Amino acid sequence: MQLSTWNINSLTVRLPQVLEWLAANPVDALGLQELKLTDDKFPHLELEAAGYQCVSHGQKTYNGVAIVSRLPISDVVRNLPNFADEQARVITATLATAQGPLRLINAYFVNGQAPGTDKFAYKLRWLAALTEWVRSQLAHYPRLVLMGDFNVAPDD
């Protein structure tokens, strides 16, 4: 199984590159981050024409995540159910593989800024909620992949 992840920094701008890359690299699933578009603007038709199913959790101007897959997608959850958040940072889905269900969590991690700031505190709360979500999913799906843009540095 081949999985890839890509912080696309605007799917509207980079859709031609995504389609070209997928044609040259026919991965089973691709996690996209920083879509910078709402779900109603997501290019489902173009990606489906290239042979991919897709689910998205978009947000205008910032954030946004998607899963693009050659495999059937089900059981989609947008955001973290245990964390009230307006930012579109997580999408979770199950892929039907020949080896059985694979739970895929695609996340655009918070960039926390410097320790002691409100953004850093938000990042720590978000990471705790993500950890809880991953643990709950592992209890039901022993085959799980956490992918995305982790935005992790030693001090922020």
Segments predicted by a language model, with ranges:
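Short, flexible loop segments at the rims of nucleotide/cofactor-binding pockets, characterized by
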Residues: 6-11, 79-82, 121-124
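Binuclear metal-dependent hydrolase catalytic cores centered on His/Asp/Glu-rich metal-binding motifs
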Residues: 117-133
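Short amphipathic alpha-helices and their capping/turn segments at secondary-structure boundaries
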Residues: 20-22, 90-99, 129-142
